[in-house]
Amino acid sequence: MKKNHKKLWKVLTIVFAAILVFCIVADVVTNYFFTSVNAFLLADTYKIVDDGVDGDTDYFPDEWAGYDEWFSYYEEDLCARTEAEGAVLLKNENAALPLGNGAKVSLFSHSSVEMIYGGTGSGSVNTSTAPNLRKALESAGAEINTTLWSFYNTGSGASYKRKVPALSSCAAKGDYSINDVPWSLIEKEAGLTDTFASFGDAAIFVLARSGGEGLDLAMTACTDEGTNGDYLALSTNEKDTLKALKALKENGTFKKIVVLLNSSNAVNCGFLDDPEYGIDAALWIGGVGAYGNNAVAGILTGSINPSGRLVDTYLKDNAYNPSLVNFADCTYPNAAEMGLTETNDDLQTNVNYVVYQEGIYVGYKYFETRYEDKVMGNGNPGDYDYAAQVYRTFGYGQSYTDFAYSDFKVTENSERFTVSVAVTNKGTVPGKHVVEIFMQKPYTDYDKQHGIEKASVELAGFAKTKQLNANQSEIVTIDVPKELMKSYDANGAGTYIVDAGDYYLTVGTDAHNAVNNILAAKGYTVENGMDEAGSAAMTFKYTQKDQDNKTYSVSAATGKSIGNLFDNADLNRYAASETKVTYLSRNDWTGTYPTATTVVRVTVQMAKDIANEYVPQTHDENGNPYVMPTYNANNGMTLAMMMGLPYDDPAWEKLLDQMSFAEQEDIVINAFHNTKAANSISKPATVETNGPQGITDSFFGGKKSGTAYPAEVIMAATWNRDIMTELGGNIGTQGLKTHTNGVYAPAANIHRNAYCGRNYEYFSEDAFLSGAMMAPEVKAIQDKGVYVFMKHFALNDQETHRAGVMVWANEQAIREAYLAAYAPSVTESHAKGAMTIMNRIGTEWGGACRSLLTDLLRGEWGFDGIVITDYSSNSNFTVQTQGLEGGADLWDGFRASDISAKQNDPYIANLLRQAIHRILYVQVNSSAMNGISSTARVVPITTWWQMTEYCATALFGVLTAACAVMWIASKKKEKKNA
């Protein structure tokens, strides 16, 4: 009798059915995440068919094509040069640095073998080929204590690693922990301390702190002993190591102690001058990028003279920053009562807020202004002690040589001041020097009456000299636009004004030196409380006779009138608010200084505004009814035909008429690191990716990975716009080589304090410096055909609760301290993209804020590019209809459409068409069109991975069915034979 295989067929049926179900589910899921899967697998979704001849279609050629190896060398060199000009020498007692060639050194802390190269999250970088500090120093001629290195790298000290929160679904989870090696373990390691004397020219201690996307640095929750919860303070293990190194220096084992600050966030710096630690020199190196360690080694050994200047105020203790009591985790006390909730694991919050109570007084603008008022006896400064709080001010940086100024001159015309000064290298070491020009505006009775604030000094211009040899001089000339004299008057004129009174310009070695120069020009001396004498000879006074409310009340870029746009972000002007904010004011420092979190209670109207229900519109602003646009026309147009035509050329209407509603919708709402192809107009798909330090990660669709440059904060610290142009050009070339058409960078959010998780990704605490450094980078990237998305526009200055946190600030601060960082990239460099914020401005999501995206960005600044949201899949408030109304064009994410149900709504249909017009206008003039002629057709194809899925589904469907048939047949046969 033949054996019955019923059980076998049953098992096979179940197994194949399970695989079939898996294939079906995989097919559904991968097609839902179609964009991301294509990006990850580098899959083509279309092919180009071109039967005609249209000349050269390499519109943006790769000038390094065929020379990839040489380009890599150039990238390495530029990375090192950026670090060389950005690293800041903070301290150098008795010329402890440079160490000289052949120095024998010992590297301390686990961070010496595991340095910070960038940040985490969207700005993470590929540093797989980066030379470590040991290799860099050895290449520079130093000898390294390899026994100590091995102890940290692979020995008993290797398990002591930093803990940094990991980014998951746009929210970082985990703890910040320093976790450095205890000194007791070093002492216990057999023979380790015996090696120190042989490598005793210097003990180099690396202090590293990491930041990243999704979570701010811990102010009270750091788990390391001795920090009191402050991640930017020294841990007990670090303190013990530094104390032990001092003891070893005192007994002659080490000659000097050098600290490297490997952090883009300003640490508490009081310890650097604490005699308990005996530190001789300190060098801030930030996030060094892939090859920045080569420059760090050059600075330490002396082949490079540091010329970087601080872009933030470095405090002895960051607790002195006035913003900290209103930072990170603030919750409306009556949120639950008003029906507001926090949902989706902090990926969507309706209950959190932050008040920028410090107003314009960010960073040095607070510390220097209160210092000046203390000296002059103005504004009730109280017992303020500048020297006890500030370690190094904005713009500070030492050199291995000395520079001197002479022949300071200022001329002026109706548009600008022109400042010139001679800079002479008075030392023996060749070096570069940064010339910094600061302006002081008068603080008038009108200002006090109308709530206008003025900092004692504001950066107004800068330039870096060439390399100057001993006794060599250079005359540096800097233009200062008179527009910088303006201040925003929200409560009086409702526009920009120029106050009557005395304005000062001065050249200063840093912000504090600038204040002292102006105080000297006013007749003050050290006898009045100045901590050092200033130079009146380095100042210029200009007197504005009358208050001017007209000159800057109209946009120079567009001719539009400028007026209040952000009343609803200021709790003192927002009609629904019952909270009054006492903003920090130099009219009464002691009485207005923030001492506790500003408590904000939600009103009924505020709760309604937070809900922000969509209200359909039927007529435009002129009273004309909206009508449905044309779809699916056959006009014979292709996108390539529009190349070079103005945005308002009539031909655009014919092109847009060819598209379907579905095509337009698919492009707009599914723009996670890409935009879809549009067959009706032969639009190719595009690839966009992150890139604050360069296009360094192929995860989202790049064909290769480029070099990771130093963090943006180091770029800014070069104070060298020529380097920014070089960096931008190289990032653009990276885009061409990786087939990346757009880059989510640069970013110009402000270092409101040292604890923002993404300070590494932003330039500075100062909006002027941020804007001046970002603009040339933007231009250079776009000159290569790669469009930028400057981000995060705007007021995304913390990571905690970033998905929905409500930012409350006054209009002067919003415009002067934050938005000003972005303006030059639009008005001068014509940025073609902006990425919005996840948070809210007042109660309104930034991606739907018409005041920001339409009235200011497009209306005042003349922006004609694409606005894309930040990642929007997790938050229900990132409503597409409202975003289109506000001025957003693309949604970075994948989620169900809010637009489909309104495809017959002429208002929404026209907004969608407007968004597509903007997108196409940018992309047709970009590298996305390389290889596509006006006669080319984009033909959709099934991707290889889809074909694989379809075949697998079909195969296991057939196998399941066949096995099921055999199983049933076996059962019947068994019954028959029973």
Where are these regions (language model features)?
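Terminal connector regions
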Residues: 482-558
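Glycoside hydrolase catalytic-domain context in secreted enzymes
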Residues: 1-487, 497-503, 511, 562-978
